[in-house]
A protein has these predicted regions:
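Positively charged, polar, low-complexity stretches
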Residues: 2-43, 47-84
Length: 84
């Protein structure tokens, strides 16, 4: 298994087991839809995005005020506009 496959496997796991069911549903659906179309850079951006805690990430997704800075990149824009 190469490093890209390992990163994809890690991302899939981290998107499915979050702690907040709503985030598990949102992130896992998003990842399953996009993961095979992402470049290595986008996969790394997604991996970085998954490092944020669910509470802040969910508030950001719902356009509520958060105390952290979520990166503004292609992956975060796709997630922000993603609907289940």
């Amino acid at each position: 298994m190469n490093s890209i496959d390992l990163l994809k496997k890690k991302i899939l796991y981290r998107s499915e087991y979050r702690g907040i069911k709503e985030m598990e549903l949102l992130l896992n659906s998003f990842v399953k839809k996009h993961i095979n179309n992402f470049s290595i850079l986008e996969l790394k951006q997604l991996d970085d995005l998954l490092n944020f805690d669910d509470d802040n990430l969910f508030k950001w997704y719902l356009d509520k005020k958060v105390k952290i800075k979520i990166p503004n990149n292609k992956v975060s824009k796709l997630l922000k506009n993603f609907k289940i």
